[in-house]
Every structure is written in structure tokens, then in C-alpha cells.
Amino acid sequence: MTIRRLDPVLIDRIAAGEVIERPAAAVKELVENALDAQASEIDVVLEGGGKTLIRVTDNGCGMSAEDLELSVERHATSKLPDGDLFAIATLGFRGEALPSIGSVSVLSLTSRMETATHGVALSVEHGRKQTVIPCGQPRGTRIEVRELFRTTPARLKFLKGDRAEARAAADAVQRLAMAHPTRRFTFTSTDTAGFDYLPCAEGPEGLLARIGAVLGKDFEANALPVEAEREGIILEGFIGLPTWHRANGLAQYLFVNGRPVRDKLLTGAVRAAYMDYLPAGRYPALALFLRCDPQEVDVNVHPAKAEVRFRDQGLVRGLLVGALKQTLQQAMHRATPDGGRVALGLLAMHSAGQGQRPVSSASMPSASRQAPTMPPRDWIKEGVQDWDWRQSPARPQNPPQNPPPGDRIEMSGSLPLGFAETPAGLNGDSGKELSEAASETPHDEPLGFARAQLHETYIVAQTRDGFVLVDQHAAHERLVYERLKQARAAQTVERQILLLPTIVELPEADVERLVDAASMLADFGLVVESFGPGALAVREIPIVLKDGSVPALIHDLANQLQEDDKALIPLERKLDHVLATFACHHSVRAGRRLGIEEMNALLREMERTPGSGQCNHGRPTYIELKLGDIERLFGRG
């Protein structure tokens, strides 16, 4: 077979397969062109998932007849005036988008510059360019793409349904809209929901408003601001609380110099920053913007410009991981406020299921409405009917600014990792404890003061404007985990030598894994060695685990190491998994009775500990209900 030259139309169609692989890619390229033209308003219309029609209209600078004719020629661009591919400040730069689209569709362009008296129009039908003609057109450019991929049926065969393609196009527009909050974006489609993002103010507030418009208003309530700079690279944006996680990574928006990217370096850094806070298979929601000198990043490494390459990848990764970890630690004990709303919703559903009308903030009766008349009862006649809920001691009065110093209970110091060993609960002398605790002022501590323990599992604490419900095991597990990490970093893990070694029987593969990890485990105070086939001898344990079950700990560690080996988890992550397993075994269990002092000590330690709003598995350690919400449940709002 002899070699022959391909005709230009076929060459363009082959090239289009790299740049325009689906309608969403065409939409992205056209919107990027509008942004490069300094448009302040961009309108996108889709029909048939973009296969029937794509129309992008903008009010940018427009094009002259000469520019319009050149715009559909391959590798003709106005965005590389000096030919430097390492100083690119625009979204587009190759001059491939329009000729690629024109080779696989019917492409119509209409444009007018502000200084021109009329507009100009040009059509390209499946690679065949027509003549430029004058026309009427407001300032800006309108581009229509029809019959996309009609002449390449193989490409059409691999496209998804109209709804899926329209959603992909909407996502492409949303990502660009998030990166340019001061501009207006409208999107209309026959196959999926549209949107109209009005311009937002410059600065963090405007950026958060645009992110909230894309991700939903709940993100604004669960967002943490991020701002950092290192050696000329600036990081800004917002990240979601760890308890506000998602089932996939679609809510992760990453930008480099205003360009949406899906870069493995950046997503890996995000995963590393959140690894102590999220359960397996869950992903954070965030929008992060990196800005740097164009010379420090190469954007010409991917046909669709979805990936970039940094000159100093270690610097970028270090900045991202460090800034995100610091932000999450500064959030301290904060957890998502959605937990309270979910609890209220469940209460409302339960009320409805019991034959009562559903309770909602919209249908709550106000305090001024007349309550239904109840049949007379003897206990009502004895004075209960005169009780005024507004005089309830549970309602905050005007407390002193600070509780007495003697009422503050510290967990650190003599009790570095746990509680007092004497069990206490809600019987026996606990009534005295509760009466004494009732005199405390709960309003000046973020998590309030303990009032009761439910089912020996949950702590009820009163705050200034409501109460919090704490999962005692989940909260203590996070506290122990953070203290173990500090001890590991300081190399101060205390050990206890066992008088007689504990022998644990295990499958030989598990014994081999634990022996291979012996040096790592020794750093945490756990000394193990092989004890013949299928057995392991434990000679030393961390002193914090002296009251725990050593065999149970060894079995859990073996299971964790097996899972890590399957997932090829790096050593650093394995160390954290070992610590998390230690913490779980040492934490106070559900079903353990706690005294008021112990409960308050836990609350104070939570307030001082970074990340205590969620346990090691990413679940919230507490939920908060506001007094106003509680009152609405009872029709008093």
C-alpha cells in the first residue's frame, strides 16, 4: 500500500476528533472565545443535546470581515502576538476550535465590531467555507453550530443521550461561570434545566455568591475560605466542611489562571489534605483558584487544555495541601449545620407518621394563633394551665459573661487521652451533679454545658440559643486520634511492657503483614514479633491502650493493613490508619455512663481540638438545634 496525502477536509475532521469529541467541548471552546473577547454577557442555547443546535451569543469586541475569514482557518489566532507558548494569558491560543467545529458541522458566524456600521457573516458547511457577506448585527458575535457530526456517523454513535450531553455542556459553562463571577452567563436547553447567573461583585463575597449559585446555597453555609501565597503562586477559593461530603468528585472545581482543569496533581493534593476527615469513597466539595505567572505553568499539554503542567510541582502541591489542612484545622470543632435541619425534618416526618399534620417552617403556627381547645383534665385545673413557656429555665436569660473558673474542666494534663475511670451516670449521686451543673452558665462556650446523657451514648449540652447532641464515642475517637498524632510527631508515645506477652492467632498472611510493619508499629508503642506459624506475640503496647483488648486491636490492624495493601496506600496514609485504629480502640464506648464533669471535659476538649466536628470516618460528632427551630416544632415560633 502506497503512502498518499490526505485532503484538507479529512485532515480537519481528524483534528476535530481531538479537540471536539462531544457537544460540550464545542460549547466550552466557543464560550472561551467569548471570554477572551472581553464579553460581559454570554448566552448559550442548545437543542438536541447540542447535536441539533448550539448557539453562543456574546457582547464582546467582535470581528472585522478580514478577521472573520481568518478565524475559520486552521492555526490562525490573535492570541499569540509574539509567538510565545509559555506566556499564554488567554483561554484559547491554538486557533483550532472554529476550523475543527466547521469541519464536522454547519457553522454560521455573525459579528460586528463596536466601530463598524454593520456586521459581517460567514458560513462553513462541513469544511467548505462560503463568502463573507454584510448583515445586521449588534455589537459582539453570534455563532451557530448545526448538524454536529452528521458527516461523521461513527462519532455520533459514541455520544450519549441528549439529556446527558446537555448536562455535560451545562457543566462546562458552569465551570467557566464560576471562574468569571463578574460576568453574566445564561444557559437554555431543550433537554435539561437552564440557568441565569447574574454578575456578582468583585472580591470573596461575590465569588462565594457565584459558587453558591452553581453548587447550591447549602454550600455557602458549609464553606470555609482559603487564602494562601507562596513564592508568587496565589491560592484562593472556598472548601466545604468535611461533614459536607459527596459521593463523587463532580463538585470539585479547580482553576489555574481562570482556566478550568482536571489535573491529577491538584486532585491528589486535595485528597491528601482531606484524608484525615473523610470516609472512604467520599469527596469534598470545593472551588479553588490558583494564579501564577504564565511562565510557571504549561497549558499546551492536552488537546482540550484540561490538564496543565507546573514548572515546580512540589511547590504547588505543598501550597495546596498546607493551605487546605490549615483551613480545616482552623475550623476547629465546626460541623455542618445541615445535621440540625435533617433532625428537624425527621421529627416532622415522625409527627406526620403518627397521624399529626406535617411540621415545617412554612406551616408552623405562630405563638399568636389560638391553640385548639383541649378537654378539661384534673391536672390542668391544679395550676399547670398557668405555666408560661417564656419563663422556662431552658430559655436563655441574661447570663454573666464567663462561667466561674472552678466550673471549667480540663481534659488535658493528668487525663491526656481519656476520662476519669470512675463510672457515673444519671442515677445514684448524678441528681446532685445535674443540679450543680444547672447552675452553670452554658452560654459562653461554643458547645455549651452538659445537661444529660441519653442511652449512655449521647451527650445533651445546652448552648446560648439551643442545644447540641454529641456522639460521645465519635467525638472522643477524634480527640484521641489528634493526640496520638501529636505524640507521634513529638516521638513521645509511652509504652507498657507486658509481664507475659499476649499471643494472638492469625492467618499466616496477616502475621507476615504485621511483622513487615513491626518497625512502623513500634513507633506507636506496639511491639510485635512472630511466634511460630499463624501466631503473633505482642510484647509492648501503648500505655493508652492498657485497658483495651489487645487481640481485638491486632485483628483490626491486620484487616486495615490488608485493605491498604490492596489499594496500594502510601506509607504516610498507613500510619494514619494505624493511629485511627488505635484511637477507635481507646475511645470511650457507647453504653458507658459518664458524669457531668466528664461530659463537660469532653466538650471543652472538642472546642480546643482541630477537626473535632467529625470523627475519623467523616461522620459528624454532634448536631446543633437552635431554640427557634425547637419552638417552631411546638408551634411557638
Swiss-Prot record:
Residues 353-444 are annotated as: Disordered. GO terms for biological process: mismatch repair. Residues 378-389, 430-444 have a biased composition (Basic and acidic residues). Residues 396-406 have a biased composition (Pro residues). Keywords: DNA damage, DNA repair. GO terms for molecular function: ATP binding; ATP hydrolysis activity; ATP-dependent DNA damage sensor activity; mismatched DNA binding. Pfam families: DNA_mis_repair (PF01119), HATPase_c_3 (PF13589), MutL_C (PF08676). Belongs to the DNA mismatch repair MutL/HexB family. This is DNA mismatch repair protein MutL. The lineage of its organism: Bacteria, Pseudomonadati, Pseudomonadota, Alphaproteobacteria, Hyphomicrobiales. The gene is mutL.
